[in-house]
Amino acid sequence: MKNSFGMVSKDKMAEAARPFLERVGLDVDPNEFVGRLSIGQQQMVEIAKSFSLNAKILILDEPTSSLSEKEVDVLFDTVRDLKKQGMGIIFITHKMAEVFQLCDAVTIMRDGEFMGERQSAECSESELISLMVGRDLGNYYVRTYNKPGDIMMEVKNINAGKRAIDCSFQVRSGEILGFYGLVGAGRSELMKAIMGLDPMDSGEIYLNGEKTKKHDPAYMQKHGIALVPESRKTEGLLLNNTIKFNTTLAVLDRFIKNLVVNTRKEDEITEDGIEKLHIKTPSSLVNCSTLSGGNQQKVLLAKWLATDPKILILGEPTRGIDVGAKAEIYTIINNLAKQGLAIILISSEMPEVMNMSDRMMIMREGHIMGELSHDEYDQERILKYAMGVSNNE
């Protein structure tokens, strides 16, 4: 695709790219930077790229983990069209609904081993889950409801650009407060503003009844708040470093004095996390990149639990992990609440928030649209709040 001077021609490249983009229904300028596109659009660019390679088989690895519902619908329509055109699709997912919605046949794997193959029209969700985890999980949401204690954090009228607009809420010890919303609702952005990771335009934060004097991550961590980010691979862990390195990264001051490392204390912190969270590993010196998604998530939890938080903010804690690992994470969350931690659970999976939280805040476009207690939970009502539809309609 060179011009008459032997140089790469951007115009010719754009012209060649257009039919591939049109084939996946992507209406964007071929000269646009990929980094400026939404995650869903980036996913479509990857698929369009496969056409330019004349691919006959397309492998999609957890393609919906960061997509909005609208983007998922577009992706599924594209996959169905590709199937009609004769392309073979390998669709890797942990989400049961996607298996039955999209796939003809299902291959189940566990710990690197082939566990079985089924026709999706001839099997049930419980059968697949049993094959995936090696046992019948029943209801794998683990939640013991206790009366919440004192208010641990109160947020008043937080404003942070368009990410958070006049947001107020409180969370108590022993309580799991759920934050639900569609992708882009502002849940994670609000928590980052509270934590001091993003600038806050106005508002007040009270911890144990006292107004915070500063607004930065070090101050908030020192006063008992820990934020477990939603992306363990890009924000949470240094995957090419060891479990020990990652687990102790947030508490270096506990075992490093005058540039001298107290290796015994470092080992104690690491082994405590491995034991309490049942991290499956032959050694704390194993790189996190070699672990399963579930065990990576446990390492990330161990990292922030090592700071001894009183308030734990969990961003999408079960994203991209299998149902067995999810059940283990739910047990951990439930036990932490029983121990008195105030937990804020951010999730885009409605069943997760409904089954694990005591109360729920629903967000849309930076606004808190509604608050529901557990006995008020109703899927239709929650979705109306999330979509900005009046519950009186």
Model-derived features with residue positions:
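Glycine-rich phosphate-binding loops of nucleotide-dependent enzymes
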Residues: 1-393
